[in-house]
Amino acid sequence: MQNSLKRMWALLGMLAAFAAVLAAQATAAHKAVTIVIWTDSDRAAAVTKVAGDWAATNGATIKVVTKNFGDIRDNLGTVAAADAPDVITAAHDWTGQLAANGLVQPLYPSAAVKKQFPTYTLNAFSYGTAVKKLYGIPAAVENIGLVVNTKLAKAPKTFAQLESEALAQKKKAHLSFGIAVQQGSGGDAYHMYPFFSGLGGYIFGVNHAGNLDPSDIGVASPTLLKNASLINKWNKEGLINSKVDGATAQNAFLKGQAAFWITGPWNADTLKKSGLSFKVMQVPAIVKPSVPFLGVQGFMVTKYAETHGVGSAATDLVTNFFASASAQTQLAAANGRPPANITARSSDPVLAQFCAASKGGVPMPNIPQMNSVWGDLGQAWVKSTKGSGATPAAVAFKTAARAIANKIG
């Protein structure tokens, strides 16, 4: 009996020592892990804090590199492996391009994690022809809305009311436009999308498999062309003017000149600090619902994470930690966009109004062919709403559709 006890204690001692060695090795391995994250200035501080919390728990090191948002996508394809990131902040419409080029890795979050997100946010980060795979974890959602200065105009129930009140305020304030919506010489298909969808336009159709079909281009759809005369009317009366850029639109609204401004939640703080009485709503239907584009932003794990030996750690950070309600609440507070995680929804009343304005919205296409659309669609609006000498809308949109089709091939 005594010998048995001795053997048992000896065995327990060996097991304890072995466990201690494994723990020490694990800790050393975690401490050796350095994860590089590329993000933009809006999120850098919050990403550093949130990722730092994960790193402290896991004995890892986080290095955050700040870049202009669009440069994250563009630089990922040219950076040397040694300088490449393991994790990036990304827009969902980058998914097709990055996945097709093998620059990001598919993610496989648990069913419990997936349940915390609206289906469209996960679909937005999914890509594939035969089988779709998830390439990003959603972190924030955004869409534009119609901001109404309620001291200058009533919230319109119809597009005709919007048009009438906008033109009345245009005349009163001696403006060259009725609705403060940004375009500028470069065009802005994103901010013009509610008008585009309301007239019956669409970007790509959907095939029998449920995938976007880049051969079905709706930039000059029959419904849009049938209603193109409305664009000519808006141009003639000055409801919309493509010479208006972002700064002009914002200043006109904040100075109490324009009664209507089309913008997104990134300007929520600006609105709250303006002292104006305002309401955010969806643009009223024209001939069809004037729905906005839906944008989803999140995090992706790059192909370089495996090269750097941190694939497992980077995946855990993104699929489990960045997906959590606590992490997304912190990120939302920093970048002024509602969190994608439904249990982390912001209680901010202005963000809630922008969320309500997203009803029926269309996720921006995430296939590579979308890169061929932005410029020409934006220019169709620029040319047809530039005031004197404008191109008839039907001509402008047919021209854009042909140019897009030629680029896609």
Task: Please identify what each model-predicted range represents.
Residues T78, A84-D86, K114-T150, K288-V291, ...:
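A structural signal for short loop-to-beta-strand junctions that line the ligand-binding cleft
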Residues Q2-W9, A24-G96, P265, V287, ...:
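Conserved N-terminal structural module of periplasmic/extracytoplasmic solute-binding proteins
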Residues K133-A139, I144, E163-D213:
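Extracytoplasmic/periplasmic solute-binding protein
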Residues H92-N143, K157, Q161-E163, V280:
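Hinge/lid segment of periplasmic solute-binding proteins
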